[in-house]
Amino acid sequence: MARPAACLFDLDGLLLDTEPLHARAWREAAAHFGRQLNAAELMQLRGRRRLDCAEQVRGWIAGAADPESGAARSDPPSVEALLVHAQPMAGAPELVRRCAELAIPMALATSSSRAAVALKAAPHPWLELITVRVHGDDPELREGKPAPDVFLLAAARLGQEPSSCWAFEDSPAGARAAEAAGCRVHVLLPEGGDPEAYPEGVRWLESLRELVL
C-alpha cells in the first residue's frame, strides 16, 4: 500500500484518551438541568466543537441552558484539572514519530480550542512533532465537524489535496467530516461505538498499532 501524502489527525479519543473526561463534563452539565444523557447522546457529541455540543445539549434540555452558560462549558474546573493527566491512546506516540521519521507531513484537525489543546498536549512532547494545526476556534474555520472544513483547511495548510491524505478519527462526526473532505478515512472505533453510525468504506482500526507505514 502506498504511503499517504499527509496524515491528518483528530486529537481527543484518537491521539489522547480524553473522551471519557469530556463525556463526564457534558453529563454533569446536563444533570445540572435535570437531564440525564445516555450513551448514544454522548456519542453524538463526540468529536464536535464545544459550542456546537452546547447547542445540541440545550435542545435536549428543552432550551433551559444558554450556550454560554454552564452547559456550554465542556471543561468544568474539576474535569479541566484531569485533562493534563490524559494518557496517549495505544500506539499514538509511535505513529506520530514514525510519520516524522518518514517525513510524512502531519496536521492536527481537532474540534478543541487552541487553549484546550495546549493544556492537553503539554505533558506529551511527541505532539510537538505535529506543527500544523487547525483548532476548533481557528479564525479560518467556518463550520465544525461533521462539516469537512477542518480537514480541507488542514490539507490546504500542508499544501496537499485531501484525496491524497489519510485522516484518522474516532467519532462519527469526525469520520463524516473527513469523508466529505475526500480523505481516506481510518477510524479507531471507540468502545460502545456503532459501526453503522460511520460512513461506508472507512478503514477500521482496533488500535493505532495496527497501522504500518
Regions found by a protein language model. Give the residues of each.
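Helix-loop "lid/cap" segments that line or gate small-molecule binding pockets
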Residues: 27-30, 49-64, 120, 154-155
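Phosphate- and divalent-cation-binding pockets in alpha/beta enzyme and binding domains
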Residues: 25, 53-56, 91, 116-119, ...
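Conserved SAM-binding loop
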Residues: 15, 88, 106, 167
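Active-site neighborhood of HAD-like aspartate-dependent phosphohydrolases
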Residues: 1-43
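Asp-based, Mg2+/Mn2+-dependent phosphohydrolase catalytic module
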Residues: 1-5, 97, 113-114, 118-213
